[in-house]
Amino acid sequence: MDAQIEKAIEIAWDPRSDPNLKEQAVQYLTQVRGDTSSLQACLNLFTRAPKAAEVVRLVSLDIVNNAIQTQHIDDQSLRGLKEQLHDYVRRTYASGNEVDPPALQNKLTQTLTFLFSSLYKEGWESFIRDFLSFAGHQNGSVDNLSGVVLYLRLLSSIHDEIADLMIARAGEETKRNVELKDLVRARDVHTVAASFQQILTYWQGNNDAIVEMTLKVIGKWVSWIDISLVVNQDILNLLFPLVGRNPNGGEDKVKDAAIDCFTEIVAKKMKPSDKIGMILFLNLGEVVSQLISSPALHDLRNTSSYDTDLAEAVAKLVNNVVSDLVKILEDAKVEPDVRAQAEQLLQTFLPLLLRFFSDEYDEICATVIPSLTELNTFLRKAQPLPPAYSAMLTPILNAIIQKMRYDDTSSYADEDELTDEAEFQELRKRLQVLQKTIAAVDEALYVDVLSNVIGSTFQRLDEQNGQIDWRDLDLALHEMYLFGELTLVNGGLYAKSQPSSIAAERLIVMMSKMVESGIASFNHPAISLQYMEICVRYCSFFENQTQYIPQVLEQFVSFVHHSHSRVRIRSWYLFHRFVKHLRGQVGNVAETIIQSISDLLPLKAEVPRENDDDMSSDDGNHDAADVAFNAQLNLYEAIGCISSTTSTPIEKQAIYARTIMDPLFSDIERNLEQAKSGNAQATLQIHHIIFALGSLAHGFSDWSPGEGKRAGQAPVKEITIEFSRAAEAILFALEALKASFEVRNAARSSFSRLMGVMGVAMLPLLPRWIDGLLSQSSSKEEIAMFLRLLDQVVFGFKKDIHEVLNSLLTPLFQRVFASLSEPVTGTDDGIQLAELRREYLTFVTVILNNELGSVLVSEQNQAFFDPLIQSVTSLAKTVTNENGNLAASKIAFNVMTKMAEIWGGPTIATPGQPITSPVPSQPTFPGFDSFLIERFHPVCWEVLRDPNFRPLVDAQSKSVLNELAGLEQAIYMKTGNMFVEHLQGNFFPSMGVDGSGFIKSMVESPERKGLATFLQNWMKGKA
């Protein structure tokens, strides 16, 4: 059997093997893996001499490994494996002969670890001592390199298997691991601790790899053994020289491992008094101070030889110490003397923490952010703050502010440093959180420190005639941007034209100095961006200090022409934000602005090349063009804002709109014929123009249909006339190019924006918009989005839309029904179908809710009434939990309930109240009472009897059930005894169901919830 397995492994792992033969070999090995009788053969292949090929030995041992791990092996076989492997290790490792390659050592370690887990309790109690004995050529020595390596590997692997808290384990496994740790503590922990000392003593200076391995194992085991076994003078006498060795720098893995070992020792859970005692015993404050003062971390700090690995290791140690000290101080039960010691240690460690927090390398800074965050949180809670704690705030805040500054070596936004830039901005966000915490602890200090940093920088800028490091100015502006958040929390800069707070008062002074200082002309892209961002964020300053607006507008006109593309593109958006917010204060400046930025308005579409979608392509030109176009739309919207200010005469507003739009109309004419011929460049150009027209309209009026506060405001006639030309131009292009997704997308966006400037004048054009936007090429998603727009139109113009809606409903529903009936071709298509169903039903609901239901039953749309009802009832009955069916079902039941309420006539029965004198139903049109009973009511019971409908276990189904109950009660309220008699004499008998309970609940429950509860219980009893 040994030979068969060996041959199968060789064939399976030989790339030259015949595929059919290889498949047979793999199948055979799969059988071997599940057959415990083959384990002996596999173990023989691993241990035999002469040795088999490495892959044969590795696979064979893996099969054994798997059998032990999955416990598919009896105790007797386990003991046999133990004896054979023990003998193999003794022959191979204890003798110091040629050992196995690393991959085999790893697999052997894993197998032995699984044997430890299975037999250490009973069967191999001497496991640890046996492998320690292989570490020396003579009894009690540790001079056998291969034996020591295997012993340390096993100790590390045992920890990972039974004590690593980062690995989630099942309950039984956790229980087993607790027992094994207890057994190790009772039997072998003293032996293990002594072996650490022996190995470090013998191999220190002889083999750094062994010393490093030992330190890492100590760091692991210290978390679950008695701390005194490691923290004693003998071990420390060995550790301290390792921590302090090689002070002049250079990579030293042993030194880093020794510091990591201290870090793990400090991290061990223990009582506060014991933790303080250990930190003092280890004299960690002095140890860390000496490391910081060593040439490796001090003299070489600002050089390329700086030992970042060492710095990160020491930073991690400091982070753990400070974190533990904060936890002790947060514990209200800690004894006063222990608290006093913790406070003293915190005073010692804070400068050490801030040293690493201020490190030029952000990775090192990030290492101590967790403990600094914990400290700041503790200080925020410790109110009122004792003087000792208050004194900590200033150095912490100063360190945070300084860390916000760009490094002296950084070059802003160079192409090859964009990743570094993104990482730095992410660090700034983390630092901002820390800074906010300081503000929460002591706002007055925060205001003073930041005011000083910002004010002194502005003063230096003035004194040095603008000759200042851009990094310092960027820091001041960044802090100014953050500083203003205090004013936002307090309700803004001004209250009744006066500063709302001390912080607001300071920010107002800063804003004035910033605008007056000439910073806007400082020649650096970072400064230009910061300046604009601040102006936009604190626009309310300019509402009160209007004298600065012309100056800042002039600066923005300069920024929108900036030579740096990042500044230029961002400025287009910020310029729009600025003028939109201040449209009431900018005055009649449209003509000047339009003349100043007219050179930026021409649109130039760039068609993506075929390889732009290739993942391997690094050409970002198309993305850049797309970003630039989207930013350019902000210029059009900004012009719309400026042109429509209250101080600009209406005639002038119309002229400005015409001035901008006429070139766009001409551009459409130039490109339309080529676009109709399929020219992608021309089509995309028209797409851009349509978007630009919509953006200009949005600038003139950002009102959307349905906004109650402005719904009654009619657009000015002169402006409506101008933008009616825009609507005609867009429709002209859309009708010619409705097969183009890009053109439809642009037109749909502009449709909603033109509503704001055209109002009811858009309504007669709706049929043309629908014809263009809902073409045969339109996707379900497009139709759903347009229905969502129509919801707003119906709501916003419900008094004026009746006739238009009546005329467009049939063609609209034809397109919707056609799309609903199309087969689903994939997951995305299914999602779009679900969205279309919801939007279609919501649109019908909006019509009914806005007293426009008559259009659904008008003579013009009568032919579509029955298909409408069929679609609604069909969607109500579709309750499988996929493709959003349940959400659509809920809306469909709501639609039927609305129809019952609107067309069912007056209420003749009230649930919860007896019918004293029966009154016949009086539906809005004849026969609708019977329609409710014969068409709507059966839908409810089809759903209730559908096995896919499970309101007992599914929240969405339960929601559908509630709507269903509402429909049943609505039918009863409109038809009264007619419905009850139908249920008693016809419906329930034909089903063979006792419906008396249902009828009783429907008639007597004052709310639908009672009936829904009855139906839920009925379904529970049926289940």
Swiss-Prot record:
- What is one cellular component GO term in this UniProt entry? nuclear pore
Q: Which keywords accompany this UniProt record?
A: Cytoplasm, Nucleus, RNA-binding, Transport, tRNA processing, tRNA-binding
**SUPFAM superfamilies (alphabetical):** ARM repeat (SSF48371)
Q: Which domain of life is it from?
A: Eukaryota
Q: Name one GO molecular function term.
A: tRNA binding
The record's section on InterPro entries has: ARM-like (IPR011989), ARM-type_fold (IPR016024), Exportin-1/Importin-b-like (IPR013598), Exportin-T_C (IPR045546), XPOT (IPR040017)
**Would I find Transport among this entry's keywords?**
yes
According to its UniProt entry, the protein's GO biological process terms are:
tRNA processing; tRNA re-export from nucleus
Q: What is its main location?
A: nucleus
Main role? tRNA nucleus export receptor which facilitates tRNA translocation across the nuclear pore complex. Involved in pre-tRNA splicing, probably by affecting the interaction of pre-tRNA with splicing endonuclease.
This chain belongs to the protein called Exportin-T
Please state the gene responsible for encoding this protein: los1
